Amino acid sequence: MNNKIALYCRSGFEKECAAEITTKAAQLEIFGFARVKENSGYVLFECYQLEDADRLIREVPFRELIFARQMMVVGELLKDLPPEDRVSPIVGMLTGVVEKAGELRVEVADTNESKELLKFCRKLTVPLRNAMREQKILSARENPHRPVVHVFFIASGCCYVGYSYSNNNSPFYMGIPRLKFPSDAPSRSTLKLEEAFHVFIPADEWEERLASGMHAVDLGACPGGWTYQLVQRSMMVQAIDNGLMAQSLMDTGQVTHHRVDGFKYEPTRSNIYWLVCDMVEKPAKVTQLIIKWLVNGWCREAIFNLKLPMKKRFEVVSENLEMIDEQLKENGINAHIQAKQLYHDREEVTVHVRRIWSGVPGRRDERF
């Protein structure tokens, strides 16, 4: 019975992922219950009605899920797959369920234990793909516009089999973008901002919204991991931090370093497009800082991190996003708000806010 959905998430954030999908499902009047195993890297949500699982992965916008890396319909757990023929039972599960899917992904959860299965998954992929093409479960060639077949192994002989829709899923294997750490970047945090650009900004809009010559501000910049990404895109950056910036960034001539507390700095320029911020501080304090920048029209788009407490993490994120939405609306500002726990995030989520227009005349950003 395909009345379940599986969601991949960061290990340790299963409860948050479960709370989020339960909330989203209830908003669609879809009811069920989540099965959570701590530190497993995935969550199962079982719907009471058979057809609701498919409806859920169609109607819950994947881009709005904060803690889920992938979302798919799955059937019952296939157990004790025979070592001499693991392919046939998997193909049998999909017969009559999926036709001419565009891609096959044989995956595991993102945990140290599961990673030991990755070599096995790669080895199984080719014979499985061939068998699925023979049975017309997969199309003869990969097609990005067709559903994706997922074979999700939780142990060597146990897997869930299912599908996702290519217009409402993560395009990445295991839901993880493969980014390479640049050897000249001052810190690994640079990958957070690079991933955020991939997740929040459509590729066909990069030229317009991540354009050469733009002005940007990085609050809490040192040593310059996030500034590095802006410099690489030929932006002019105001780096705000009492600490030291990497000399390699200063040598570019694109960075002006202000030794000021990020919470106290106020810009003198009126043409700042990007604000980025990765400061270790309570979420509500960072949220209020970003709201101040947006309400004053000091920037057009912002990407920032919210460091999460040990408990009530889903509630804290929800409250802060609601706070942004409410206060911007109170000030006559329409904005597009997104949030995601990125692969390169740890105990935090990354938020993106884009001002669409202002109902209050004379704001700085209306003069862009």
From Swiss-Prot:
Record: residues binding S-adenosyl-L-methionine: S189, C222, P223, G224, G225, D241, D261, D278
One Gene Ontology CC term in the entry: cytoplasm
GO BP annotations, alphabetical order: methylation; rRNA processing
GO molecular function: S-adenosylmethionine-dependent methyltransferase activity
Signal sequence bounds: none
Active site residues per record: K307
Principal location: cytoplasm
Record key words, sorted: Cytoplasm, Methyltransferase, rRNA processing, S-adenosyl-L-methionine, Transferase
InterPro entries membership: RlmM_FDX, RlmM_THUMP-like, RNA_MeTrfase_FtsJ_dom, rRNA_MeTrfase_M, SAM-dependent_MTases_sf
Keyword Ribosomal protein set for record: no
The UniProt record lists the keyword Cytoplasm: yes
Enzyme class: transferase
Entry EC number(s): 2.1.1.186
Record field: catalytic activity: cytidine(2498) in 23S rRNA + S-adenosyl-L-methionine = 2'-O-methylcytidine(2498) in 23S rRNA + S-adenosyl-L-homocysteine + H(+)
Compartments it resides in: Cytoplasm
Biological role stated in the UniProt entry: Catalyzes the 2'-O-methylation at nucleotide C2498 in 23S rRNA.
Family: Belongs to the class I-like SAM-binding methyltransferase superfamily. RNA methyltransferase RlmE family. RlmM subfamily.
Classification via PANTHER family: RIBOSOMAL RNA LARGE SUBUNIT METHYLTRANSFERASE M, RIBOSOMAL RNA METHYLTRANSFERASE FTSJ DOMAIN-CONTAINING PROTEIN
Oligomer status and interactors: Monomer.
Name of the protein: Ribosomal RNA large subunit methyltransferase M
Organism: Yersinia enterocolitica serotype O:8 / biotype 1B (strain NCTC 13174 / 8081)
